[in-house]
């Protein structure tokens, strides 16, 4: 059962403040955006004796645990993912998340704890542990192991503007064999890296839950404190929402990222950039961009534009299914050896997405058709994810 303090922390109105209907409605939406409740309702009561208004909030609890399983099928094999997440641990609003991804040559595990209101300070605090192992000795001549953790906080610095600060440390071991390229052999050895990260989040969306208007601008930078390669990573995303017609939600998103060494060293394989699969649908995860032999090594830069629009008039009688279209356009380029550059090859895809809320949990499908691609890119026309709650 959710603690009352968790609900009260979402209020944008304090006791004794003049009543503001706009803030009252935003408060209701903030509670809904927690995704802890099946139903949220409010009732305003006039207290004629004290000349005040009483806001009564009624909520209906729902399961907040999730078990997620996902799989992808494409031209380059399969990827399986499984995760367990509790979004409201002990009713305190704490999020505990574990995730395991099993690929044909890589295993990644994560454990994260997020407290959105640490010690009633209105500051988010998070802690995480991560480990990964990429075994590509038989195919590409190298193997890497990486383990470490992070600690960070995020808080509202100005109205609608949040500042995040995070520190992370990782130990990495990389080994190669005779089949590895010279670039990979140069990176063989042990590494210890400590970074400090900053993120700046300007959020002018009308609501976090089912956003239909407004925009969000987000920038983050990772700066090396202790590092052998001294890589600086930048990321920027801008997304704007609009309702083109009744019940429709359309959005345009721009994402930019870069990774470069400030001391002129080669960027480590594990720090190179890959376009996130959710931003370039229709392509296999990590199988886009510069190739060293037969190994996809990522790039120093990427840029992606995403256009999406819901289709509320289709299956309008079924409240459990959301249907939408999308167009993804992106490019990834730049390597420390310019002979491998693929900056001229633009990738794009068009497709259909389906979110189906079934009795066993949310089920999502993605059908994508690549329009343009690089000569070495691997495609993935269909992907699904299945989750359940507890």
Predicted region positions:
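N-terminal periplasmic "start-of-domain" segments of outer-membrane beta-barrel proteins
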Residues: 1-13
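C-terminal soluble interaction/assembly domains
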Residues: 13-18, 342-344
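Gram-negative/organellar outer-membrane beta-barrel architecture
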Residues: 20-218, 231, 242, 248-250, ...
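Active/binding-pocket-proximal capping segment
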Residues: 28, 74, 254-258, 322-332, ...
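Extracytoplasmic gating/loop element in the C-terminal half of outer-membrane beta-barrel translocons
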Residues: 53, 246-326, 334
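Strand-loop-strand
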Residues: 87, 343-350, 354-358
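Acidic, glycine-rich loop-and-beta core segments that form the ion-binding/anion-interacting portion
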Residues: 217-259
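Outer-membrane beta-barrel transmembrane domain signature
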Residues: 249, 329-350
